[in-house]
């Protein structure tokens, strides 16, 4: 058994998807930086209070933290960590880069990229695991700014200047046992002078995934029905413990290896965050009609196609049970359940993101209006996360690189 202690700091940790996967792979957290109180509440409950994943230094408060403030306030302490940190993991929030939303060039969140580089410069970890949306590799409007370069190029050049051998790649998480088409920019860096090169990470990740999944009884390709068929509303309902006036679904029997894997360590009788949305009769009737009559599954109903089907919202996708899901976002109204006239629950989204059922989400379920800029409710926490099952696989490969 490997008794070596592998140390990691998680930046922009969100609700903890990356930290969870690294924890499962045997990494020991030093601390995590997450600014949003909603996401931090989930991270704190699952991995700080209850799993003791983090050693957490006395000089750093266990509370929501802004990386820019951490860099300013604790420069001396961060520099003292040099030589003790194996890995700095994480990537800045995606809203400023994502192709799914409006790309905002002067978005203050984009400044977080440079705070990330500053942090790396101070701590000098052996390894870097950087994750972001695919849109991170695209420059802003070339017509307005002919000299614009993508942020990915900036990060790569800055890390190389700091003395890291880096390798970026676009990864589709559906190729790693996760029931979701989710393409992300992944960059691995190894500090110059250490054995190995960053290219090896992606080679090993690919060559070792089959054995990893087989060892856990999991398939490489997992469909939506494989992930959530035990969470049907028809299993029965009960009052939601943490959401007054709403009903939650009960567990059905495990039907797949994927369900067994994610349920195996849960002691919950009622699935956490499996609370059903309130739909008007008009909307429920619209959903029933779509399930019965709409001919195409897994493709967004958008634009002029909406009106004939009574869709008033911006668009919706009727999920195909026998395919992987589209990219899970923070907006619950994007997807219609494959067999029931309702949107997906937080727990169903979490299953598709590969969170185990023991992992409990905290704070509000949804938000809206101006609060959307401040709050990160449960749906958004799940939609923003790195799938733990991928992070688990990445964590095992990174341990190999640490050992040379």
Regions found by a protein language model. Name each.
Residues 2-127, 133-153:
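Core alpha/beta nucleotide-donor-binding catalytic domains of modification enzymes
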Residues 16, 38, 93-95, 134-135, ...:
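Short, solvent-exposed loop/turn segments at secondary-structure junctions
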Residues 27, 181-182, 321-324:
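Short, well-ordered loop/turn elements at secondary-structure boundaries
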Residues 47, 92, 137-140, 159-163, ...:
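A generic secondary-structure signal for well-formed alpha-helical elements
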Residues 74-82, 97-306:
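Class I S-adenosyl-L-methionine
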Residues 248-404:
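C-terminal target-recognition/interaction regions appended to catalytic cores
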